């Protein structure tokens, strides 16, 4: 290939980054409601629908609110984004792994909130890293981001096939492999949380050592820039929008 072609080629590291980013979430979230609600006799946790909503939706909403402060105030100003990404993912992976061994609603709720606060900023950090280093981000970023969607679909399909079924048979139509669900499938579903924790820690090591360095921006901006955003809540239309978004999230 010509030098120009090489210069405009997407670095494979960003494909790996985006795949692992969404594989971590896709491993456990699509089946979370089932193992959280399944009875303890079947190996589940026996939580109510209200409790499951708190664990999944409320924790995610709190994480999404905290994300701009962590990603914007810390990664963009004081710490290299790749290093910040690695730390958030490693600590989050440990929390996720510990969560898998908990059996009470309170433990799952607080650990899920802590995990969401750490994980949600990584979404914007991966986007920022890719956009900062891609030679032609307008054309190349959609392809890189699409790998994340492929990762979500792949792991959400592969884990149940490999770990929750037996006597698999191939078929030409999706999901391509079908079999008999194991009697203790709800109990084995919780293993997806453990695997997600391990994958997150491995991904963190990849981010620390493999991703390109991007220096934090020390542009003299206000230290507490998010205070300006909070001031917008005084505007009636913006306050209504925020309130509606929070209610929809719950």
Question: Which functions belong to the PLM regions below?
Answer:
Residues 83-97:
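Structural signature of the two symmetry-related core transmembrane helices
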Residues 159-163, 195-216:
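C-terminal membrane-cytosol helix-exit motif in multi-pass small-molecule transporters
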Residues 4-62, 238-245, 249-250:
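Helix-loop boundary and gating motifs at the non-cytosolic
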Residues 19, 95-96, 105-125, 129, ...:
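Hydrophobic core of transmembrane alpha-helices in multi-pass small-molecule transporters
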Residues 1-9, 209-244:
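Juxtamembrane intracellular "pre-TM" segments in multi-pass secondary transporters
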Residues 57-69, 153, 157:
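Residue-level signature of mid-helix packing/kink "hotspots" within the transmembrane helices
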Residues 66-80, 163-164:
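Helix-to-loop junctions at the C-terminal end of transmembrane segments
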Residues 38, 73, 154-193:
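Transmembrane alpha-helix termini and helix-breaking/packing motifs in multi-pass membrane transporters
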